[in-house]
Structure formats: structure tokens, C-alpha cells
């Protein structure tokens, strides 16, 4: 069992925390020392953050080793905030502060009048409190209405009256978020949204390490690591961020979306809530891949605003909605397992349409139409990646002769599979392509994958109600590879 932490200044001086190398150590030096130790151990640098091992993380490490303030530039859903929160794992497990201090005063070098008076009065009997790493992380979303008082502080007449202080007394100050983040990490998200005069207020903190409260000549020598996030377009646009502030940010680091479907699936599996503690959930591999590829297709779609980006949250919420639709079906039908189908992606359209911002051309046809196209293209890309293009001539001929097929989204696995078995050659084509899998759920997903791929290539059509039918013949010279909407 570890020894209890000191509770008074005298006990703190006699403990290892009172050693000469611990006194006056800045938070940047603390993070640097812990980061070097983690690098030497070879463990994961930032637990829970995936895909940045060879790109972003080395740059973040360099910034921290250089004791820089830094900014993460990237589109939404690129784990910028997650990465900043992971910095707390580089802080010491416990930090001593003067009990009751609003500015987390160092017992050996207090910066506030409260801290100095407390030590002058109590001496070695000054009570000591301890902060955990999470208590030393302060995060703020920048908005145009954020004021200098919010970040730095203001004179508080009510506090002065209650304490019997003059307004000129430092004890009448109501501290903002930055002083309260002293000896910790302060993260400001969406920096360009901060008003220019408030950005000016950050200058001294970044350059000199101190702040001034209004016109009162109090200077607080803050010890804080400043981190920021921003959208690259906003960050570089003139007028969004003032040049002197940008010049004071030590490192500018660009984030990105997952570079491969396999990596993206790993992230989605980590973040999505699929193990629900009720009926067992088994997601066919092709269904999970199609769901993941929807985001990749969206990032290539010209009718979607790529300056806004397509968040990784799209894949996460999409998979959760897919599982929920399958869960509802399994409960109603009394099935022993929750087995999602590709058809469930269409029931999860709200998870897609709510995550994309459309260009003018996209607004004309609507988000739902584009979302359906993304699903079909994702299915086609999945099939091509796994087995290459499939002609499925018998299947196409059957539909071209006027036949149609509609399998209810609420049908169970056995019923749906029976419906797909009426299409000549479909099950054989799926098995021949190696899409049959281990059970009927995989076989069903393989059937849907083939049909959706044929729809994407305009060899079949799929109505909004889910009915597959023959393709509408197009004029010679028109593309037959990419869908443009529901037939």
C-alpha cells in the first residue's frame, strides 16, 4: 500500500515531493519528463487514439518535447479533442496545491495573494490538497460571445462586498478559466471563432506566461500548456485568427481521417456501442465493411461539402443504428441473435444525412437520395475489393425478363433467405464468390451485397420501398458505373 499523501506544507517539505528537483518544476517540464519515460518504455503514447502513430503523434511528441503551445488543424471527427484529453496521461498522478486556492497555487511558489497570505499565516501548517490529472485539464469551446472576463477574469463587486475587500484588492478578482487551469493544460476548441480582442488577451499568457485583470495591475505568472483546435480553412482565412497570436503558437499539426478501411473499422469497433447486454449481436463482416465504406464514399462525393468534412462519427452512429434496427427485428420475431443486414443501412439513413453538409447540387436532390447512393457505392466497392466485379448474368437476366423481388426489412434471416433463393443463380454466385460465410446470416448479407452492387452499376434498380427490379435502359454513351439517384 502506498504511503498517504502529505496534508500540510511541513509534511510536504519532508516528503519526496519537496525535493529540490520537484520544487518549481513547470507543467511543460513535467509532461516532457513523463513523455520521455513513456518513450523509453515503448508503450502506447496516447491510449484510445488510433491511426496517428506514424503521422500526427510524432509531431505532437516533438511539440511537447520542445515545450511548445500547439494547435491541431483538422476537419470535424478527426479525434482532435480526444488527442488533447489524452495529454492528461502525461501528467503526474497527484499534484500538491494550497487547499482552497482558485489558481492551484504551488505551495513552494504561490502566485495569488490568497496563497501567499495563507502560507504567511499558517507556515508549515498550511493545508495541502491534491489534484488528479483529469482535474488539471480545462477545455473551452470558443464562440463569438466568449469574453476576456470568461477566459482571464474580472473584478467582482459582490465578492469584494462579501469579503470586505476594496475593489483594488486582488482578493476581489473573479478568476476566469485560464487562471483556474494554472499548473495544467488548457484546451481551446475552434480557436478562429474567438473574437479578435479576446485573442489579444491570450498574447501575454503565451509569450510571458502572465495575465492582467482589467486595469488592475495584478500579474499572475501562469504555468499552463495552451493547446488549440481549428478547421484548416478557418485558421488560414484572413480575419479568422490574428497574425500575432498565430505567430506565438509553437507548432501547427495537421490531423486527418483514417487512411484505410481496416483502420477505420478498428476505430468504429472501439467507439460504437454494439455489445448491449441483451440478445447476442453478431455483425456479418461484409455489413460492417459496407457501413464503414459509406464514409469513405462520402469523402469522395462532389455534392457533399468537403471543406466541412465527413466525420468518423458517421460510421460510428451508422453502425449503432444498423444494430438497433436489427435488434428491433430480432426482438419482434423472437430470434436468438441480432444479425444486421445490408438492408438495415437504409433504415439508418438519419445517421448519414445528419452528418453530411451538401453543396448546391446536392441540396437540389436531397440528402436522403445521396445517402442511398453512398450505400450502393459502398456495397459495390466492398464487393470489388473482396472478389472483383461479378457479372451475375443469370441474376440480371431474371430481372430483365420482368421479374421483381422485394424482401421485407422486417423479415427474419430464414424468411429473407428464402426470398433471395427465388432468384436463379444468386445463392450459387454468392457461394462461388466466397461470400457465404459461416451461417445463414453471412449468406444473406452476401446476397444483398451482390444485388446492391448490381444496382450501383445500374444493372438493376432498387426502389425506395426496397424492391429490386430490372434496370431502366440508358441511352448509348451515358455512364453505367456510378448511380445518380433512385430509379
What are these regions (language model features)?
Residues 2-262, 273-289, 302-306, 383-487:
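Conserved ASCE/P-loop NTPase catalytic core
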Residues 65, 69, 88, 296, ...:
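Amphipathic alpha-helical core segments of compact helical bundles
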Residues 268, 291-295:
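Short alpha-helical scaffolding segments that buttress acidic/His motifs in well-ordered protein cores
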Residues 277-284, 297-371:
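C-terminal helical "lid" subdomain and adjoining coupling/linker elements of P-loop NTPases
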Residues 357-400:
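Charged, amphipathic alpha-helical linkers/stalks
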Amino acid at each position: 500500500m502506498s504511503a498517504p499523501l502529505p496534508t500540510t506544507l511541513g509534511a510536504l517539505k519532508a516528503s519526496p515531493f519537496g525535493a529540490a528537483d520537484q520544487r518549481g518544476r513547470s507543467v511543460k517540464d513535467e509532461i516532457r519528463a513523463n513523455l520521455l519515460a513513456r518513450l523509453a518504455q515503448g508503450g502506447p503514447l496516447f491510449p484510445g487514439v488510433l491511426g496517428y502513430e506514424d503521422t500526427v503523434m510524432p509531431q505532437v511528441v516533438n511539440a511537447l518535447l520542445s515545450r511548445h503551445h500547439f494547435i491541431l488543424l483538422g476537419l470535424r471527427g478527426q479525434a482532435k479533442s480526444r488527442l488533447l484529453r489524452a495529454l492528461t496521461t502525461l501528467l503526474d498522478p497527484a499534484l500538491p496545491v494550497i487547499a482552497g486556492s482558485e489558481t492551484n497555487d504551488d505551495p513552494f511558489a504561490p502566485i495569488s495573494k490568497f496563497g501567499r497570505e495563507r502560507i504567511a499565516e499558517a507556515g508549515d501548517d498550511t493545508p495541502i490538497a491534491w489534484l488528479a490529472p483529469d482535474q488539471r485539464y480545462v477545455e473551452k469551446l470558443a464562440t463569438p460571445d466568449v469574453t476576456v472576463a470568461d477566459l482571464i477574469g474580472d473584478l467582482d463587486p459582490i465578492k469584494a462586498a462579501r469579503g470586505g475587500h476594496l475593489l483594488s484588492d486582488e482578493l476581489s478578482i473573479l478568476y476566469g478559466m485560464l487562471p483556474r487551469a494554472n499548473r495544467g493544460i488548457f484546451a481551446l476548441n475552434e480557436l478562429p471563432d474567438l473574437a479578435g480582442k479576446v485573442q489579444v488577451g491570450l498574447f501575454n499568457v503565451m509569450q510571458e506566461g502572465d495575465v492582467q485583470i482589467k486595469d488592475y495591475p495584478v500579474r499572475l505568472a501562469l504555468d499552463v500548456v495552451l493547446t488549440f483546435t481549428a478547421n484548416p480553412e478557418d485558421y488560414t482565412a484572413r480575419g479568422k485568427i490574428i497574425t500575432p497570436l498565430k505567430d506565438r503558437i509553437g507548432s501547427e499539426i495537421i490531423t486527418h481521417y483514417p487512411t484505410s478501411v481496416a483502420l477505420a473499422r478498428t476505430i468504429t469497433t472501439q467507439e460504437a456501442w454494439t455489445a448491449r447486454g441483451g440478445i447476442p449481436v453478431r455483425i456479418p463482416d461484409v455489413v460492417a465493411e459496407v457501413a464503414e465504406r459509406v464514409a469513405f464514399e462520402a469523402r469522395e462525393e462532389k455534392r457533399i461539402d468537403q471543406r466541412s468534412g465527413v466525420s468518423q462519427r458517421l460510421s460510428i452512429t451508422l453502425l449503432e443504428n444498423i444494430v438497433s434496427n436489427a435488434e428491433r427485428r430480432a426482438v419482434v420475431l423472437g430470434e436468438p441473435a441480432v444479425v444486421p443486414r445490408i438492408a438495415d443501412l437504409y433504415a439508418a439513413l438519419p445517421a448519414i444525412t445528419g452528418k453530411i453538409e451538401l453543396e448546391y447540387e446536392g441540396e437540389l436532390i436531397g440528402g436522403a437520395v445521396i445517402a442511398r447512393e453512398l450505400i450502393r457505392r459502398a456495397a459495390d466497392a466492398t464487393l470489388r475489393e473482396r472478389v472483383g466485379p461479378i457479372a451475375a448474368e443469370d441474376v440480371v437476366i431474371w430481372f430483365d425478363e420482368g421479374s421483381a423481388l422485394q424482401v421485407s426489412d422486417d423479415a427474419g434471416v430464414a424468411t429473407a433467405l428464402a426470398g433471395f433463393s427465388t432468384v436463379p443463380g444468386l445463392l450459387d454466385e454468392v457461394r462461388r464468390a466466397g461470400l457465404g460465410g459461416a451461417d445463414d446470416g453471412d449468406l444473406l448479407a452476401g446476397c444483398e451485397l451482390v444485388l446492391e452492387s448490381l444496382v450501383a452499376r445500374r444493372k438493376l434498380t432498387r426502389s425506395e420501398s426496397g424492391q429490386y427490379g430490372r434496370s431502366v435502359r440508358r441511352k448509348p454513351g451515358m455512364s453505367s458505373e456510378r448511380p445518380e439517384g433512385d430509379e
